Amino acid sequence: MAGLQGGFTTGACAAAAAKMAAALLCGEAISERISIPLLDGTRESLPLAYAHRLPDGAEAAVYKNAGDDPDVTNGALIIARVVASDKPLEFRAGEGVGIITKPGLALPPGEPAINPGPRLMIESAVREVTDRGLRVTIAIPDGKQLAERTFNPRLGIKGGISVLGTTGRVRPFSLEAVRKTMECSYNVACASGVRHPVLVPGHIGERAAHRHFQVTQEQVVEAGNEWGFMIDLVAQTPPSALLVLGHPGKLAKLPLGHWDTHSSRSASPVPSVRELATRILECPVAESTTVEGVFADLTAEQRQCLGDTLARALQIAVSHRLDHRAPVATALINLAGDMLGSCGDLTPWQ
């Protein structure tokens, strides 16, 4: 988004802190700023929060600055403790950094949630100072609380936040970051043995999935507004069956060809839903500015008819986008989570 200020990832902050700690370990003086190489081939200088020597090593810290991005870790203190090791370079999770417990992520279970990109940045940064064997422990004091506001609990990352970053830079409201999180969720579901996933737009759909069906947390994967991306991702690793569940205010856009359902990038489905309701119900439909309002003015029998018809159109659209690589069922709900209609075989989730 134009005019928004970028920032640095937790991985870049960890690399800067680790470099300063490694420098102290090797007898160098404290610097107010730490210059590090980023994964995009550029360099940046990050301000130091503090640094001091320890009896067996050194510790340094950098405050995370995510710029204008609504990152939950913005302002968090990223701490690196560095001690000598008989291994070339090893990573440990300190306070507030999670441990991976499920397969399907970039690192195996048991490893600290310090992603491959940040590990490369940390290695490049400390190797500018020394070739000695080092143990680098990353800590984020508020990480355990911050992690509750992320996907980490669902991804099986326990005890804290992840140290992330593919380039070292934070791009405000990055679509790439959103999609990466969704991809991780689906990969974890597959690696956990989920064969009947449920795609939902968000929390309303997730709550309804648990209310109406027998599903585990891993089965339910949020697609947000990125339905084209998610269906294409599912097509790469087809499940035994797929359930798409959510509110028709978003999902009725898919049969219209709007696979990015964000309101600023897709047309309102209200006119087409009203036109469909008028045609199949053979009666006037009240004016409304929302799909929820269209359904609210119908009788229970009419709601079921319209809901099932929209669910059928949704099933056809998703099946076509999926290239018919898996059976698709669909279910539509209102904002209260009540069922409006469905299509396809729902027994795998019952």
From Swiss-Prot:
GO molecular function: cobalt-precorrin-5B C1-methyltransferase activity
SUPFAM superfamilies in the record: CbiD-like
Key words, A-Z: Cobalamin biosynthesis, Methyltransferase, S-adenosyl-L-methionine, Transferase
Domain of life: Bacteria
Pathway assigned to this chain's UniProt record: Cofactor biosynthesis; adenosylcobalamin biosynthesis; cob(II)yrinate a,c-diamide from sirohydrochlorin (anaerobic route): step 6/10
Record keyword Magnesium present: no
E.C. numbers: 2.1.1.195
GO terms of biological process kind: anaerobic cobalamin biosynthetic process; methylation
Coiled-coil region: none
Chemical reaction(s) catalysed: Co-precorrin-5B + S-adenosyl-L-methionine = Co-precorrin-6A + S-adenosyl-L-homocysteine
Pfam families membership: CbiD
Family to which this protein belongs: Belongs to the CbiD family.
HAMAP family: CbiD
Designated name of the protein: Cobalt-precorrin-5B C(1)-methyltransferase
Organismal lineage: Bacteria, Pseudomonadati, Thermodesulfobacteriota, Desulfuromonadia, Desulfuromonadales
